[in-house]
């Protein structure tokens, strides 16, 4: 029986530099998105929400999860991708960690997956800076989101015409 070959130092260095990350994939209108699990505090199912008047299109509304009021974003709308008209109850809300009290709306959530940093490809030009990259998993393309940048993009301030006296 032949003995296994020794791996070179460069192979060992490459293996050490390739870190593993857990992602929580979710879907909206036949598009797959994901966030790193260390950005997610919890998931909630079947949550009614209240729409906010004059809110940007990517803001679905507010929802109460575990006694906290969260602003819920539609990632697809924030990225100017096809989305859906949300009914009065959100199928899933991904509760994000942090003081911003944000959540992401989802039609469905999938099981957590583990990927290597080497598997992450640069995002497409259309996703701007709200996407960290794209990963292909089980034959599907998943867009990895940067939750903080997604919020900034969703609520971009646009100059409105002001009344002058």
PLM regions and their residue ranges:
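An acidic, low-aromatic, low-complexity terminal/linker signal
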Residues: 1-165
């Amino acid at each position: 029986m032949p003995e296994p070959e020794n791996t070179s130092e460069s192979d060992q260095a490459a293996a050490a530099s390739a870190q593993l990350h857990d992602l929580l994939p979710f879907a909206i209108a036949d598009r797959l998105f994901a966030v790193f699990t260390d950005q997610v505090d919890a998931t909630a199912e079947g949550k009614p929400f209240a729409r906010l008047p004059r809110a940007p299109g990517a803001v679905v509304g507010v929802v109460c999860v575990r006694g906290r009021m969260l602003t819920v974003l539609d990632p697809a709308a924030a990225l100017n991708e096809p989305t859906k008209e949300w009914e009065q109850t959100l199928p899933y809300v991904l509760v994000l960690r942090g003081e911003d009290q944000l959540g992401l709306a989802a039609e469905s959530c999938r099981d957590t997956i583990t990927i290597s940093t080497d598997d992450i490809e640069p995002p497409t030009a259309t996703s701007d800076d709200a996407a960290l990259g794209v990963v292909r998993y089980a034959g599907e393309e998943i867009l990895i989101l940067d939750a903080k940048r997604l919020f900034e993009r969703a609520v971009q301030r646009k100059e409105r015409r002001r009344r002058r006296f």
